[in-house]
């Protein structure tokens, strides 16, 4: 095995170990236990990720990347903005029915708990989420909507709202609080954020309105 292959194997082992320990212990997860579960030392964590927060940031990226790859496949390249938003919302609803949906939701809650308890971890996790979120912004930017193309800024504003609404709805589905929220409900809710175009205005664009 080459040095690069060994490095990648160790990296993968630490990420897998971090997933299990963090999911179980939350902000009380200990670096030495993560390293031990991976069959490595804490020195390997610092060598590969720089710090505990670096490992957790990489864990978020590792967790989100497959989802964004699936989203990119689910949204038709030739769809207008409403069509893209509709496809994104329907994909999001389908993830609620996946076998690993409860575990994914648990990890989300756990990472949020860690971000609130650790001043160093919070910004690192937020940076990882923003980096992956930029891929979603790119999926919406440039699509036609009401005779114009969606700008990068508009796509950013829309993405922020979409993720907030759909994450909340998904939690409701998994907790049994939104039993009637099927794919159509998700799609209608998401499309409503675009209808009226107020959300799509650039900041300050409506300042002069009466």
Please place each PLM-identified region on the residue numbering.
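Short, flexible helix-adjacent loops and helix caps
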Residues: 23-27, 72, 76-79, 97, ...
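Hydrophobic/aromatic-rich alpha-helical bundle segments in the mid-to-C-terminal region
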Residues: 3, 122-126, 130, 145-210
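Hydrophobic alpha-helical connector segments
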Residues: 58, 72-105, 151, 155-162, ...
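Solvent-exposed, amphipathic alpha-helical segments
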Residues: 17-24, 70-74, 107, 111, ...
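Helix-turn-helix
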Residues: 9, 13, 17-62
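Residues in soluble alpha-helical coiled-coils and helical-bundle/repeat scaffolds
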Residues: 26, 50-54, 58, 76-79, ...
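Amphipathic alpha-helical segments used for helix-helix packing
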Residues: 99-126
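Hydrophobic/aromatic residues within well-ordered alpha-helical segments
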Residues: 10, 52, 59, 63-67, ...
């Amino acid at each position: 095995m080459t040095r690069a292959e060994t490095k990648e194997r160790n990296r993968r082992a630490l990420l897998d170990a971090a997933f299990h320990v963090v999911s179980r212990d939350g902000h009380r997860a200990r670096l030495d236990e993560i390293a031990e579960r991976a069959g490595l030392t804490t020195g390997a964590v610092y060598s590969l990720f720089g710090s505990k927060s670096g490992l957790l940031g990489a864990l978020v990226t590792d967790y989100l990347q497959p989802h964004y790859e699936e989203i990119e496949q689910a949204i038709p390249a030739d769809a207008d903005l409403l069509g893209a938003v509709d496809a994104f919302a329907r994909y999001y609803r389908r993830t609620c029915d996946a076998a690993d949906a409860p575990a994914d939701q648990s990890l989300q809650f756990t990472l949020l708990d860690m971000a609130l308890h650790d001043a160093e971890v919070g910004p690192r996790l937020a940076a990882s989420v923003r980096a992956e979120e930029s891929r979603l912004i790119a999926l919406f930017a440039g699509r036609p909507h009401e005779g114009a193309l969606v700008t990068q800024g508009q796509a950013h504003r829309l993405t922020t709202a979409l993720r907030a609404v759909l994450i909340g709805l998904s939690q409701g589905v998994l907790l049994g609080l939104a039993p009637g929220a099927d794919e159509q409900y998700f799609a209608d809710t998401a499309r409503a954020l675009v209808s009226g175009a107020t959300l799509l205005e650039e900041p300050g664009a409506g300042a002069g309105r009466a």
